[in-house]
């Protein structure tokens, strides 16, 4: 097993975590174990919104039987023999990229490696005992650049892997996000239109449905304590956050369609941050022209 982590704090070495790693990693079908990531403490409203988001994601992973959507770069443990198979599959053209474990031109290398491992027939797991903490962005600018990389990287990974049994759930996930985006803006538009035309009415049915949404938002972040609840209860705060994330989706799709150059953005402790351009990720058919290294 090879550990891989880049987070501020990780708890994969605890007794419960080690036992969980061994239990889920022992079967031949398990290719890697990733941590269930939560947000680092500190920061203001932007940081707390991310912590709420990560708490809900951890809950979702647990409800899926500890099956990981993505092997988090914060802390993961990977089988050596599986990584060798990934590298060989890249060399043979069965996976995107050329010889190496990581596709170093992928914007989201951890997501890409997850797809690679699953494509070879292995499971990726995230046991609830393997809690890790990752940094949160402290301002909207840093969060925008981070999520642009995540969203665009995820879309480009799917474009390279194409539709398959492995990628189908990811395509469905992206489709649901896009449909949800249209539904939300339709709701906003109809609400504004009814208010302008004077036809706006409060109906008990929709109030009841809204109450269900409020309860869901509260229950899903209950473990986060009062700070999480203060953000979740009003709903409007997280509603604005959802609109922000939807703007990321729209811009990511636009950048891909227009062929805009992707950027790596590195937030720093100071006021300045570095941005560097990276080569556009290529499909597997172009892998011979790429210079990739195994990490």
Language-model features and meaning:
Residues 273-295:
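Short, intrinsically disordered terminal tails adjacent to the first/last structured region
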Residues 8-24:
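Acidic donor-binding/catalytic loop of UDP-sugar-dependent glycosyltransferases
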Residues 52-58, 142-164, 214, 248-253:
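Catalytic core of nucleotide-sugar-dependent glycosyltransferases
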Residues 135-152, 231, 268:
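Nucleotide-sugar-dependent glycosyltransferase catalytic core
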Residues 22-106, 148, 159:
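Long helical/loop segments within the catalytic core of UDP-sugar-dependent glycosyltransferases
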Residues 106, 111-133:
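Catalytic donor-sugar/metal-binding loop of nucleotide-sugar-dependent glycosyltransferases
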Residues 176-260:
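Membrane-embedded multi-pass helical conduit in multi-pass membrane proteins
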Residues 1-6, 82:
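Active-site nucleotide-sugar/metal-binding loop of Leloir-type enzymes
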């Amino acid at each position: 097993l090879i550990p891989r982590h880049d987070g501020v704090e990780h708890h994969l070495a605890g007794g419960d975590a080690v036992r969980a790693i061994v239990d889920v990693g022992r079967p031949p079908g398990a290719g890697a174990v990733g941590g269930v990531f939560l947000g680092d403490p500190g920061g203001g409203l932007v940081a707390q919104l991310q912590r709420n988001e990560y708490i809900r994601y951890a809950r979702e992973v647990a409800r899926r039987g500890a099956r990981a959507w993505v092997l988090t770069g914060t802390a993961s443990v990977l089988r050596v023999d599986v990584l060798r198979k990934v590298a060989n599959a890249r060399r043979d053209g069965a996976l995107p990229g050329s010889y190496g474990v990581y596709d170093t031109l992928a914007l989201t290398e951890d997501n890409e490696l997850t797809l690679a491992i699953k494509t070879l027939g292995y499971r990726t797991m995230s046991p609830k005992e393997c809690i890790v903490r990752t940094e949160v962005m402290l301002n909207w600018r840093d969060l925008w650049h981070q999520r642009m990389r995540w969203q665009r990287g995820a879309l480009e990974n799917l474009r390279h892997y194409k539709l398959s049994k492995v990628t189908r759930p990811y395509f469905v996930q992206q489709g649901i996000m896009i449909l949800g985006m249209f539904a939300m803006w339709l709701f906003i538009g109809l609400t504004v239109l009814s208010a302008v035309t004077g036809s706006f009415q409060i109906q008990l049915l929709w109030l009841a449905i809204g109450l269900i949404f409020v309860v869901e938002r509260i229950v899903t972040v209950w473990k986060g304590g009062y700070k999480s609840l203060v953000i979740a209860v009003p709903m409007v705060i997280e509603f604005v956050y959802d609109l922000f994330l939807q703007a990321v989706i729209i811009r990511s799709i636009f950048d891909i369609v227009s062929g805009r150059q992707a950027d790596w953005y590195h937030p720093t402790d100071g006021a300045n941050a570095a941005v560097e351009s990276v080569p556009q990720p290529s499909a597997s058919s172009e892998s011979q022209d790429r210079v990739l290294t195994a990490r």
